[in-house]
């Protein structure tokens, strides 16, 4: 079974080392390198082979660890818009590109230093000078790494933040549940999911999103509860929170807005309608279905008020599953089910994998 976390393009980036950690790692690997040489070989030739091999091993390990930072980091320009928007909010996409480019630009400098010092070792007939050349090369390469240390540190921090994002399959239709706290969103997600929903971090909220999967007919669907996101008036949000919310427009093929007409959730019916209007303004293109939950405990006069306000509303009892089948079927019908560009397997294959 696919773990949702795997669908986050940043979740499987290998461990990235700091500049000092790369230097230490490469040094330890190169000094442990064992050499085999003929006893009949002259000392100067044995030294030449040893120093060249140690330098090459040092450079090899440095490049491997640099590639973990650069080549294994997802291409920003190829990200799904949902992740692209969140990456911009959390770390800044231009800053990521700049830091990755700065680290990558170190590699030709390292190659140039390596070639020059290997050539010096090959031409030398003094075993002490060979050792000095190898140490000089390591010193210059270490200096290059230290000069780009801030870029490596930024990439490490970016990976830490972005790897926590929820795993969303961009090629599977997504239903996002909205509404005030305690209206029954998480109950709906848990009751319709075919497996235990996964819980994931979402930026600028103190609570976690709940992601479930289900099948409606022959269609696989993601359903997402958004506690702390679409559950309070927009006037209470700062600019960055609003930007994080608008990222959902790239995720939500359809929104189910749940209203508790019984007001047992702690919010009046009118307050819930006001929030609905705000969500409709923020997501003018996304289809929004309105569901009245807890109709079994709603006083008749309050239920009639809600019905009069929303003639085409869905009436459900999420805790019992009543009315959910029609709601979900119609939600999926609202989704544009054009052929997806890639299958889940293709998408997973495009993500970086830790080879360690």
Regions found by a protein language model. Give the residues of each.
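Charged, amphipathic alpha-helical linker segments immediately N-terminal to NTP-binding catalytic cores
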Residues: 100-156
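N-terminal accessory targeting/assembly segments
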Residues: 1-106
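Conserved glycine(s) of the Walker
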Residues: 183-184, 323
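Switch II of P-loop NTPase G domains
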Residues: 40-54, 72-93, 227-251, 262-278
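Switch I (effector-binding) loop of TRAFAC-class P-loop GTPase G-domains
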Residues: 167-170, 192-222, 226-246, 269, ...
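Pre-Walker A adenine-sensing motif
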Residues: 157-168
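Canonical P-loop GTPase G-domain recognition
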Residues: 285-289, 296-354
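Conserved C-terminal guanine-recognition region of P-loop GTPase G domains, centered on the G4
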Residues: 160, 240-315
């Amino acid at each position: 079974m696919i773990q949702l976390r795997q669908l986050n393009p940043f979740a499987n980036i290998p461990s990235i080392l700091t500049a000092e950690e790369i230097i230490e790692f490469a040094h330890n690997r190169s000094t442990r390198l064992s050499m085999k040489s003929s006893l009949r070989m002259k000392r100067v030739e044995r030294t030449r082979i040893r120093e060249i091999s140690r330098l090459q091993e040092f450079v090899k390990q440095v490049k491997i660890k640099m590639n973990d930072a650069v080549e294994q980091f997802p291409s920003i320009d190829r990200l799904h818009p949902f992740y692209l928007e969140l990456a911009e909010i959390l770390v800044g996409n231009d800053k990521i590109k700049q830091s990755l480019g700065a680290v990558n630009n170190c590699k030709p400098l390292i190659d140039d230093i390596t070639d020059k010092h290997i050539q010096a070792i090959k031409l030398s007939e003094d075993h002490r000078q060979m050792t000095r050349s190898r140490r000089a090369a390591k010193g210059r390469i270490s200096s290059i790494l230290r000069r780009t240390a801030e870029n490596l540190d930024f990439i490490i921090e970016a990976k830490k933040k972005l790897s926590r994002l929820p795993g969303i399959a961009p090629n599977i239709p997504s239903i996002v549940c909205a509404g005030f706290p305690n209206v029954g969103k998480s109950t709906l997600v848990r009751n319709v999911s075919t497996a235990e929903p996964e819980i994931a971090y979402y930026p600028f909220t103190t609570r976690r999103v709940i992601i479930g999967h289900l099948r409606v007919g022959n269609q696989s669907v993601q359903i997402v509860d958004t506690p702390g996101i679409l559950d309070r008036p927009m006037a209470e949000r700062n600019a960055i929170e609003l930007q994080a919310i608008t990222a959902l427009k790239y995720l939500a093929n359809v929104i189910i807005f749940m209203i508790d007409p019984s007001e047992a959730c702690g919010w009046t019916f009118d307050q819930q309608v006001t929030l609905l209007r705000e969500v409709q303004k923020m997501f003018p293109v996304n289809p929004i279905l309105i569901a009245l939950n807890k109709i079994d405990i709603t006083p008749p006069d309050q239920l009639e008020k809600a019905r009069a306000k929303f003639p085409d509303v869905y009436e459900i009892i999420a805790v019992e599953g009543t009315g959910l089948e029609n709601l979900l079927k119609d939600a999926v019908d609202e989704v544009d089910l054009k052929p997806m560009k890639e299958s889940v397997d293709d998408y997973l294959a495009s993500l970086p994998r830790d080879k360690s």
